[in-house]
């Protein structure tokens, strides 16, 4: 998904001398078993890993508001779970705290169906502490995907703020 690659590149550009080694990477074959993410996780053995992806923004007319996943314009989506992963609770709480401490618009994401590379990265080297930040997107997997510019900005800001405050001393063990 191109918008997540844009967010990753922009976050990398904005980072100024982080305290830890950070690897930025993009994967392929998510839709056929998370193969790229699993291979990447084995090669890098990250600790922790934060995946970037898009997620469903289904805040459209006629849709039951109680079944909304995310809303356009409500900020970055911090993933709690999808069908491939339950994110590390210490990591997603830290990402949420960073958002709150920096007044970054955010919403929580629970995706009832569909998975992401987060699961492949988490399982690649045992139980790698994994979290994810998603860009709320309408019309996923179509040529007319739509995102809100403020959500994309929030994803970039949140990723940068999270990485800038990672010092290697956070305990993500369960």
Language model: regions and residue ranges:
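Alpha-helical metal-binding/catalytic segments enriched in His/Glu/Asp
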Residues: 1-32, 158-159
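Alpha-helix C-terminal capping segments
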Residues: 10-16, 42-44, 122-127
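Acidic, glycine-rich active-site loops and adjacent beta-strand->loop/helix elements
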Residues: 26-32, 54-56, 137-139
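Short, well-ordered secondary-structure micro-motifs
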Residues: 34-38, 59-64, 119-120, 143-144
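A glycine-rich helix N-cap at a beta->alpha junction
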Residues: 40-60
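Active-site-adjacent substrate-binding region
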Residues: 71-156, 162-174
């Amino acid at each position: 998904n191109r918008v997540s690659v844009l967010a990753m590149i922009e976050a990398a550009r904005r980072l100024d001398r982080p305290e830890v080694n950070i690897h930025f990477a993009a994967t392929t074959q998510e839709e056929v078993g998370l193969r790229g993410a699993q291979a990447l996780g084995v090669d890098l053995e990250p600790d922790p890993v934060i995946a970037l992806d898009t997620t469903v923004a289904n805040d459209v007319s006629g849709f039951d508001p109680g079944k909304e996943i995310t809303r356009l314009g409500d900020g970055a989506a911090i993933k709690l779970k999808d069908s491939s992963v339950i994110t590390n609770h210490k990591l997603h709480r830290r990402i949420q705290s960073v958002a709150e401490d920096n007044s970054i618009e955010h919403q929580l994401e629970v995706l009832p169906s569909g998975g992401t590379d987060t699961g492949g990265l988490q399982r690649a080297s045992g139980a790698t502490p994994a979290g994810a930040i998603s860009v709320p997107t309408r019309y996923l997997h179509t040529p007319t995907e739509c995102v809100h510019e403020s959500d994309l900005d929030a994803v970039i800001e949140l990723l940068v703020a999270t990485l800038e405050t990672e010092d290697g001393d956070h305990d993500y063990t369960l």
